[in-house]
């Protein structure tokens, strides 16, 4: 079996005609293409293997390390792991699950935070998909609400 690293953006893979009849394109976050070939080195199967990111969450004086898949939110993994983190709408709207991104990056394009607030490193766990290993610190809801309202009035 061969494993090929792929870029972290939409990729197109083209293989010569003996291997595959056409090319295909798909979005990737943190993945490799794993293929199996037969005795004549013809491609017989292919699958995408995504690597989970290490996300460290600080909450209630404790630090917890999570392995979060690229297609799951940090909130869903935190809840599955037994962390008692606040949340409500699970849609990135109510601002009940705020956090400060200490290191790393997340895709939170589905959340409703203003660009100014996002640029300052704030995130909503329910709308955050890791795009790298991260360190996140839970913050009081009031801290994010006051910042979001202040930037809305600018």
Swiss-Prot record:
Its cofactor is [2Fe-2S] cluster. Keywords: 2Fe-2S, Chloroplast, Electron transport, Iron, Iron-sulfur, Metal-binding, Plastid, Transit peptide, Transport. SUPFAM superfamilies: 2Fe-2S ferredoxin-like. The keyword Electron transport applies. GO terms for molecular function: 2 iron, 2 sulfur cluster binding; electron transfer activity; metal ion binding. Induction: Induced by high light at protein level, but not at transcript level. Strongly up-regulated in response to acceptor limitation at photosystem I (PSI) in plants lacking of photosynthetic [2Fe-2S] ferredoxin (Fd). Binds 1 [2Fe-2S] cluster. The keyword Transport applies. Its main location: plastid. InterPro entries: 2Fe-2S_ferredoxin-like_sf, 2Fe-2S_ferredoxin-type, Beta-grasp_dom_sf, Fd_pln. CDD domains: fer2. Belongs to the 2Fe2S plant-type ferredoxin family. This is Ferredoxin C 1, chloroplastic. It comes from Arabidopsis thaliana (Mouse-ear cress).
């Amino acid at each position: 079996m061969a494993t090929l690293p792929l870029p972290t953006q939409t990729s197109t893979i083209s293989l010569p005609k003996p291997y595959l009849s056409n090319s295909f394109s798909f979005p990737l976050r943190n993945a490799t293409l794993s293929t199996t070939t037969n005795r004549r080195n013809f491609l017989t199967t292919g699958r995408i293997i995504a690597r989970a990111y290490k996300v460290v969450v600080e909450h209630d004086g404790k630090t917890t390390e999570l392995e979060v898949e690229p297609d799951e939110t940090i909130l869903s993994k935190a809840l599955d792991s037994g962390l008692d983190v606040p949340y409500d709408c699970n849609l990135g709207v109510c601002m009940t699950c705020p956090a400060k991104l200490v290191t790393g990056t997340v895709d939170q394009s589905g959340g409703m935070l203003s660009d100014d607030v996002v640029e300052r490193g704030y995130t909503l766990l329910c709308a955050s998909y890791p795009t790298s290993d991260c360190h996140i610190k839970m913050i009081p809801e009031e801290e994010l609400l006051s910042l979001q309202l202040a930037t809305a009035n600018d």
